[in-house]
Amino acid sequence: MPPLRWQACLFITINAVALSMLLFDAPVGASERPAAVKELGELLTGFGDSAWLICISILLFFQGKAGYKLLKTARSKAQALYVSWIGAYLFTTVVFSGLLANLLKRAIGRARPDHFHDYGMFSFTPFSGHAAFESFPSGHSTTVGAFFAAFALLFPRYRVAFIACAIWLGMTRVMVGAHYPSDVIAGLAFGGWFSLLTAIVYARCGLLFKLAPDGWPLAKRLFPDIEKPGAL
């Protein structure tokens, strides 16, 4: 991994989580969210559910596999195979980052914002077996971060839009009162890191990505039309 990039990203992540804990978590835990904000969060948060994201990855995988068998030209087969590997990559990042995040949140055992007045924002009960003590990091935000970071790496031209989607869907967990802001930031960052590391592994296996001279994973260009300005 490129030394300067990962160190800078890690520094930013740690400070963002720490500042959020110090500045934003207590006000969020102590205050009641406006009804309109909570309703908006409830409306949007389902779009980041891991079940949907896993279904998308599986659909892409099998669509690519079917295309590989049905299409005739070598170029079409290569593109279909590329789609199937995108599905496999998304599945890997979403499923395994989510599993790790769930293990972490159980091991850390941070109380959720609903219990702020009872326990405060720095109450930790590891391996309690109760969802009330599984706040940090946000598993929902982890899968969202992994999913959209994967797309940002695959299609970097649109990375700003993907990052914005991840932030919005992640912060819906704050809107509905399920997590503190620091839980969401940590989850998004963890998911993004997992996608990056997985992309590096794929690149070393010659799949989907190639490594730049500085070690950063770059998506292979098998869809030149997507790279044209204005293309979707």
UniProtKB/Swiss-Prot annotation:
Pathway: Bacterial outer membrane biogenesis; LPS lipid A biosynthesis. It comes from the Bacteria. One of its GO terms (molecular function) is hydrolase activity. GO terms for biological process: lipid A biosynthetic process; lipopolysaccharide biosynthetic process; response to antibiotic. Keywords: Antibiotic resistance, Cell inner membrane, Cell membrane, Hydrolase, Lipid A biosynthesis, Lipid biosynthesis, Lipid metabolism, Lipopolysaccharide biosynthesis, Membrane, Transmembrane, Transmembrane helix. The chain crosses the membrane at residues 10-30, 42-62, 80-100, 136-156, 160-180, 183-203. It is a multi-pass membrane protein. It is found in: Cell inner membrane. Pfam families: PAP2. Its main location: membrane. Disruption phenotype: Lipid A contains a monophosphate group at position 1. Retains 4'-dephosphorylase activity on Kdo(2)-lipid IV(A). Increased sensitivity to the cationic antimicrobial peptide (CAMP) polymyxin B (PMB) but not other several other antibiotics. A double lpxE-lpxF mutant contains lipid A bi-phosphorylated at positions 1- and 4'- and has greater sensitivity to PMB that either single mutant. No visible effect on free-living bacteria, or on nitrogen fixation upon nodulation of P.vulgaris. GO terms for cellular component: plasma membrane. Its EC number is 3.1.-.-. CDD domains: PAP2_lipid_A_1_phosphatase (cd03389). In this strain lipid A lacks phosphate groups, instead contains a galacturonic acid moiety at position-4' in place of the monophosphate group found in E.coli. Belongs to the lipid A LpxE 1-phosphatase family. Probably removes the 1-phosphate moiety from lipid A species. Does not seem to act on other membrane components, nor does it dephosphorylate the 4'-phosphate group of lipid A and/or lipid A precursors. This is Lipid A 1-phosphatase. The lineage of its organism: Bacteria, Pseudomonadati, Pseudomonadota, Alphaproteobacteria, Hyphomicrobiales.
